[in-house]
């Protein structure tokens, strides 16, 4: 508006009236008095002025202390590229662990659909918190998360959200060269949620101490199966020695498989219906263990069976031991590790369990003491369960937190 609004306020004017001036009257003349002879007055005693001592000097004003420097605590912030099974569960794990997610990128999922897919999960159930799309952002438990739909990592504005640590969970950008576009776009570090052909590979509880902040800004969290096998193999090898071994994972079907028979160029039987078949498949998990435990190079290999279950898988490690040991000694060694240095990573159970008992379990590997067997003191079969989705996603977040702690 070009004119100002004028607000009129009623003002009461009070008129002050002066009191009329009093009339001055002359006093009556005094009556005459008899003359009295004046009496001599005593001389006044001189009054000595008391001299007060000067007040003590004021103490010097204390110097103002310099202002204290308030250090701002660094905070781990995370960006997620790829909002598929692992991407969404990494976000859930971050919310559970109090890790701040600042951005999600997925060119194939509309923001409103992100809300739906994150809120409802056929395997892990409905998200217990609040989730909505508001003011152009994904809002989870009142935490605002920027949403992007960039097709290439170099297009994602990571700098605009504070240069977070990025989880590369598309399954596409697996090499250092491909993932380096995240760094160019402003990401501080990148964790690939899959095996990588050339990025340093880490398994929490096994070799995370080898992480070098000065030279490693792109790393791999290996595979879910490697995260299950490696902690168990580490305990057995360090205590008894593994001469050689074969690993088999009985693995739930994944999104890359077919619901009904379809084409598969890489391996023909991979294209058969996932819900109808037990499908032999290849896996690099056993060989990947040799990257995190170099002493086992050339001693392990393995394969997989894809089975018609939606989640939770199990590793069968059959190996020959260098030091003879009864099965009871193996159980005690694993139990001690689960209670000690590998707590939270490796677990131990003697219950009569089945696969669904581990749905939502956040451990990397749960040793089933009653399922294993020994042929003799040198040749054993060891069984360990894992939630190949949820447990793995928690390890991704744990690796992010560990890297952040080392980067300080």
UniProtKB/Swiss-Prot annotation:
GO MF terms here are: glyceraldehyde-3-phosphate dehydrogenase (NAD+) (phosphorylating) activity; NAD binding; NADP binding
Q: What is its EC number?
A: 1.2.1.12
Q: Which domain of life is it from?
A: Eukaryota
InterPro entries reported in the protein's UniProt record: GlycerAld/Erythrose_P_DH, GlycerAld_3-P_DH_AS, GlycerAld_3-P_DH_cat, GlycerAld_3-P_DH_NAD(P)-bd, Glyceraldehyde-3-P_DH_1, NAD(P)-bd_dom_sf
Residue numbers annotated as active site? 224 (nucleophile)
Residues annotated as site: Activates thiol group during catalysis:
251
Where, in this chain's numbering, is NAD(+) bound?
85-86, 106, 151, 173, 193, 388
Q: Where is the composition biased (Pro residues)?
A: 53-68
What does the record list as GO biological process?
flagellated sperm motility; glucose metabolic process; glycolytic process; positive regulation of glycolytic process
Explain the purpose of this protein: May play an important role in regulating the switch between different pathways for energy production during spermiogenesis and in the spermatozoon. Required for sperm motility and male fertility.
Q: Which NCBIfam families match?
A: GAPDH-I (TIGR01534)
* Protein name (database record): Glyceraldehyde-3-phosphate dehydrogenase, testis-specific
- Source organism per entry reads Homo sapiens
Upper lineage ranks? Eukaryota, Metazoa, Chordata, Craniata, Vertebrata
